[in-house]
Amino acid sequence: MKAIIFFIGCLMLIDLVAGSRSGYPVTQKGCVYSCFWGSNWWCNAECTALGGSSGYCAWPSCWCYSLPDNRNIWGSYPNNCGKK
């Protein structure tokens, strides 16, 4: 049992050190990429185009895995969507 807990702890530490950033990517205007149920293929294509490993539609927005540090994600800076 201790070995399993140690193994899970190591996996969590590896994820923390590797710094994989996952989240809702935002456009240049600060808006999230909108999607609808069943458009996982579109979100996956958008996420990989942004440098992520993959993505899916977490309605109403695309969720991306392993985004590079130069991509902004929702919540990492003030929301400016729809503002001039």
Curated annotation (Swiss-Prot):
SUPFAM superfamilies linked: Scorpion toxin-like (SSF57095)
InterPro entries, per the entry: LCN-type_CS_alpha_beta_dom, Scorpion_toxin-like, Scorpion_toxin-like_sf, Scorpion_toxinL, Scorpion_toxinL/defensin
Cysteine amide carried by residues: 81
Disulfide bond entries: 31-81, 35-57, 43-62, 47-64
One Gene Ontology term, aspect cellular component: extracellular region
Record's subcellular location: Secreted
Keywords: Amidation, Disulfide bond, Ion channel impairing toxin, Neurotoxin, Secreted, Signal, Toxin, Voltage-gated sodium channel impairing toxin
A GO BP annotation: defense response
Residue ranges of every copy of the LCN-type CS-alpha/beta domain listed in the record: 21-82
Cross-referenced SMART domains: Knot1 (SM00505)
CDD domains: neurotoxins_LC_scorpion
Cleaved signal peptide residues: 1-19
Superkingdom of this protein's organism: Eukaryota
PROSITE patterns for the chain: LCN_CSAB
Tissue-by-tissue expression: Expressed by the venom gland.
Record GO terms (molecular function): sodium channel inhibitor activity; toxin activity
Domains (record comment): Has the structural arrangement of an alpha-helix connected to antiparallel beta-sheets by disulfide bonds (CS-alpha/beta).
Entry function: Beta toxins bind voltage-independently at site-4 of sodium channels (Nav) and shift the voltage of activation toward more negative potentials thereby affecting sodium channel activation and promoting spontaneous and repetitive firing.
Family statement drawn from the similarity comment of this UniProt entry: Belongs to the long (4 C-C) scorpion toxin superfamily. Sodium channel inhibitor family. Beta subfamily.
Annotated protein name in UniProt: Toxin To5
